[in-house]
């Protein structure tokens, strides 16, 4: 409350100019011996491979593979995880893409491209993608609903998933 009163009484506070400027993170150089250098190296060598491995073992990729070939024969009760689990793949792609911009790694780049192939194949013809629905559009996961976006205010997580997919795309193509 007090800061609002002060800023209303002191209009110059709102007009001050910051003496710092943002720079693209790719222009910031860190030695591998620094705290952040160690952290990014650990992310590249341990965290990101583990996260991709978990996506594989927890069925995240298989949901995308099934979504690439939707079928009324798919029993959505056997869907791997929850309607928001597509984001595990997207967030891992995003983090890995940021790491690649500071510490290039051709093996990691190729792996990301292979995951992106799986994701792209799962998109519907108009670009829509939510594996919990796309796997079997006639009988989607109960959280998703029979029509796109119809349960967004409940549990479908369609916008949540879309937002994380866009974040991953931006990071990858920067």
PLM regions with names:
Residues 10-174:
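Glycan-recognition and catalytic cores of secretory/periplasmic carbohydrate-active enzymes
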């Amino acid at each position: 409350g007090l800061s609002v009163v002060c800023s209303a009484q002191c209009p110059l506070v709102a007009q001050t100019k910051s003496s710092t400027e943002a720079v693209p993170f790719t222009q910031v150089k860190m030695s591998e011996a620094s705290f952040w250098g160690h952290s990014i190296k650990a992310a590249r060598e341990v965290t990101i491979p583990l996260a991709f491995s978990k996506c594989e073992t927890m069925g995240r990729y298989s949901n995308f593979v099934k979504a690439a070939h939707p079928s009324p024969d798919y029993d959505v009760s056997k869907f791997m995880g929850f309607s928001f689990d597509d984001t595990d793949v997207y967030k891992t792609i995003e983090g890995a893409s940021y790491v690649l911009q500071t510490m290039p790694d051709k093996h990691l780049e190729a792996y990301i491209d292979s995951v992106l192939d799986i994701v792209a194949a799962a998109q519907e013809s108009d670009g829509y993608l939510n594996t919990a629905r796309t796997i079997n559009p006639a009988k989607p996961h109960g959280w998703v609903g029979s029509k796109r976006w119809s349960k967004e205010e409940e549990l479908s997580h369609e916008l949540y998933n879309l937002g994380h997919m866009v974040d991953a795309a931006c990071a990858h193509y920067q």
